[in-house]
């Protein structure tokens, strides 16, 4: 395949179309396949050759593909992206003409994937040249992919096996990757609705479902829906291929903060296994209610956490750390009160002030203590109320600090 002639290549294309062999045709138009490195196929003007062998719109599609290999050979990703848009547009015309059949879905997967990759590469080249702002090409690529998605979603006449709807999840995942990259997460919402209401949602491949759950879980995390985030990210982690250590680590980067916000702290063994020791001191700080250590841990690994987009989520752990610190204050106070036969469910606000000063919280006073306690009560982390008259926190006699998993 690396040394075939243009005529042999086009003959293989023709045969794959005639026999409706989607898998073979997908290879012949994919940049994952070795034919793209063949200098005989890297042509600046292949139109005439393609028109001699292929019917429209396949002649236009494969002429654009050969021009694309030529552009990539010259490291011109701006031109490669332009060619890839022509490939997708001409494929879409052919795909729409395939009534009640979906044999070309593998071809759609190949051209859609390459479109996203070339859009990303073109963006980088254009930004370097100062001709575009970040994400412009990706945004245009998303519009094209939405065209493919609409064709798949509107295929209501075909039976389940032959339905183009089977291609919806792959496209949604490609769109998610773009929307996360260009920071337009609100555009994910209608796509999530479409998949969740689909009667095919359990028929997609495990790999596609893992990718889908990973992105929807991340979106739920940013929306502060931590229970859904935990459910979706846990599914992605548990169903990742056993050998995909890198992918499992990627899921954990988002699953760990969610789990911690729900009160489930990771073990040091897990953090070591997936090379995520950046979370070790954060975990210890939250568990111990150690605000000083938490601030130090967040500062020490700030670059990593910001790059992963989780720094602001981890900042939310401060309220959990306050809760755990105040729970310790409550336990110590209750123990001494029982010894002195005093009321164990009333705590002086001064006790919390001392604890916060010990943790080197800056400029803290009783008003700040009341504010933190009011927040914890409002969020359900403490069952009780503040008696301003007596400057005390009055907590419930039963379960004053409910488990975090019942609160978030």
Curated annotation (Swiss-Prot):
<dbReference type="GO" id="GO:0003723">
    <property type="term" value="F:RNA binding"/>
</dbReference>
<protein>
    <recommendedName>
        <fullName>PCI domain-containing protein 2</fullName>
    </recommendedName>
</protein>
<dbReference type="InterPro" id="IPR045114">
    <property type="entry name" value="Csn12-like"/>
</dbReference>
<keyword id="KW-0539">Nucleus</keyword>
<dbReference type="Pfam" id="PF01399">
    <property type="entry name" value="PCI"/>
</dbReference>
<keyword id="KW-0811">Translocation</keyword>
<dbReference type="GO" id="GO:0070390">
    <property type="term" value="C:transcription export complex 2"/>
</dbReference>
<dbReference type="GO" id="GO:0048536">
    <property type="term" value="P:spleen development"/>
</dbReference>
<dbReference type="InterPro" id="IPR036388">
    <property type="entry name" value="WH-like_DNA-bd_sf"/>
</dbReference>
<dbReference type="GO" id="GO:0016973">
    <property type="term" value="P:poly(A)+ mRNA export from nucleus"/>
</dbReference>
<keyword id="KW-0963">Cytoplasm</keyword>
<dbReference type="InterPro" id="IPR000717">
    <property type="entry name" value="PCI_dom"/>
</dbReference>
<dbReference type="GO" id="GO:0015031">
    <property type="term" value="P:protein transport"/>
</dbReference>
<dbReference type="GO" id="GO:0044615">
    <property type="term" value="C:nuclear pore nuclear basket"/>
</dbReference>
<dbReference type="GO" id="GO:0003690">
    <property type="term" value="F:double-stranded DNA binding"/>
</dbReference>
<feature type="modified residue" description="Phosphoserine">
    <location>
        <position position="45"/>
    </location>
</feature>
<dbReference type="GO" id="GO:0005634">
    <property type="term" value="C:nucleus"/>
</dbReference>
<keyword id="KW-0813">Transport</keyword>
<dbReference type="GO" id="GO:0005737">
    <property type="term" value="C:cytoplasm"/>
</dbReference>
<comment type="function">
    <text>Required for B-cell survival through the regulation of the expression of cell-cycle checkpoint MAD2L1 protein during B cell differentiation. As a component of the TREX-2 complex, involved in the export of mRNAs to the cytoplasm through the nuclear pores. Binds and stabilizes BRCA2 and is thus involved in the control of R-loop-associated DNA damage and transcription-associated genomic instability. Blocks the activity of the SRCAP chromatin remodeling complex by interacting with SRCAP complex member ZNHIT1 and inhibiting its interaction with the complex.</text>
</comment>
<dbReference type="GO" id="GO:0000973">
    <property type="term" value="P:post-transcriptional tethering of RNA polymerase II gene DNA at nuclear periphery"/>
</dbReference>
<keyword id="KW-0007">Acetylation</keyword>
<keyword id="KW-0597">Phosphoprotein</keyword>
<dbReference type="GO" id="GO:0006368">
    <property type="term" value="P:transcription elongation by RNA polymerase II"/>
</dbReference>
<feature type="modified residue" description="N-acetylalanine">
    <location>
        <position position="2"/>
    </location>
</feature>
<feature type="domain" description="PCI">
    <location>
        <begin position="210"/>
        <end position="400"/>
    </location>
</feature>
<dbReference type="GO" id="GO:1905457">
    <property type="term" value="P:negative regulation of lymphoid progenitor cell differentiation"/>
</dbReference>
<keyword id="KW-0509">mRNA transport</keyword>
<keyword id="KW-0906">Nuclear pore complex</keyword>
<dbReference type="GO" id="GO:0045814">
    <property type="term" value="P:negative regulation of gene expression, epigenetic"/>
</dbReference>
<keyword id="KW-0653">Protein transport</keyword>
<comment type="similarity">
    <text>Belongs to the CSN12 family.</text>
</comment>
<comment type="subunit">
    <text>Component of the nuclear pore complex (NPC)-associated TREX-2 complex (transcription and export complex 2), composed of at least GANP, 2 copies of ENY2, PCID2, SEM1/DSS1, and either centrin CETN2 or centrin CETN3. The TREX-2 complex also associates with ALYREF/ALY and with the nucleoporin NUP153. Interacts with BRCA2. Interacts with SRCAP chromatin remodeling complex component ZNHIT1; the interaction results in inhibition of SRCAP complex activity, preventing the deposition of histone variant H2AZ1/H2A.Z to lymphoid fate regulator genes and restricting lymphoid lineage commitment.</text>
</comment>
């Amino acid at each position: 395949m690396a040394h075939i002639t243009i005529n042999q290549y086009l003959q293989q294309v023709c045969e794959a179309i005639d026999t409706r062999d989607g898998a073979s045709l997908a290879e012949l138009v994919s940049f994952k396949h070795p034919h793209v490195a063949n200098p005989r196929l890297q042509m600046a003007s292949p139109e005439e050759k393609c028109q001699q062998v292929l019917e429209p719109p396949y002649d236009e599609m494969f002429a654009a593909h050969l021009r694309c290999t030529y552009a990539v050979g010259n490291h011109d990703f701006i031109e490669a992206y332009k060619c890839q848009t022509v490939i997708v547009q001409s494929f879409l015309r052919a795909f729409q003409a395939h009534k009640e059949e979906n044999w070309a879905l593998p071809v759609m997967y190949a051209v859609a994937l390459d479109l996203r990759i070339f859009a990303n590469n073109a963006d980088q080249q254009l930004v370097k040249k100062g001709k575009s702002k970040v994400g412009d090409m990706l945004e245009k690529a998303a519009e094209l992919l939405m065209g493919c998605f609409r064709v798949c979603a509107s295929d209501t006449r075909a039976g389940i096996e032959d339905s183009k709807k089977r291609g919806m999840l792959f496209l949604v995942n490609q769109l998610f990757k773009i929307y996360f990259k260009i920071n337009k997460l609100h555009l994910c919402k209608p796509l999530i609705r479409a998949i969740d209401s689909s009667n095919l949602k359990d028929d997609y491949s495990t790999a596609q479902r893992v990718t889908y759950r990973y992105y929807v879980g991340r979106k739920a995390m940013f929306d502060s829906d931590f229970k859904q985030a935990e459910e979706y990210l846990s599914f992605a982690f548990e169903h990742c291929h056993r050998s995909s250590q890198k992918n499992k680590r990627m899921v954990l980067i988002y699953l760990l903060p969610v789990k911690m916000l729900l009160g489930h702290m990771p073990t040091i063994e897990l953090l070591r296994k997936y090379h995520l020791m950046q979370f070790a001191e954060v975990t210890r700080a939250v568990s111990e209610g150690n605000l000083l250590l938490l601030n130090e841990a967040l500062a020490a690994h700030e670059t990593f956490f910001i790059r992963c987009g989780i720094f602001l989520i981890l900042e939310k752990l401060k309220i959990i750390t306050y809760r755990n610190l105040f729970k310790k204050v409550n336990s110590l106070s209750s123990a001494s009160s029982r010894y002195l036969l005093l009321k164990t469910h009333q705590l002086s606000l001064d006790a919390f002030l001392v604890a916060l000063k010990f943790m080197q919280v800056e400029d803290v006073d009783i008003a700040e203590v009341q504010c933190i306690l009011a927040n914890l009560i409002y969020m359900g982390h403490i069952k009780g109320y503040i008696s301003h008259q007596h400057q005390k926190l009055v907590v419930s006699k039963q379960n004053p600090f409910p488990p975090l998993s019942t609160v978030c």
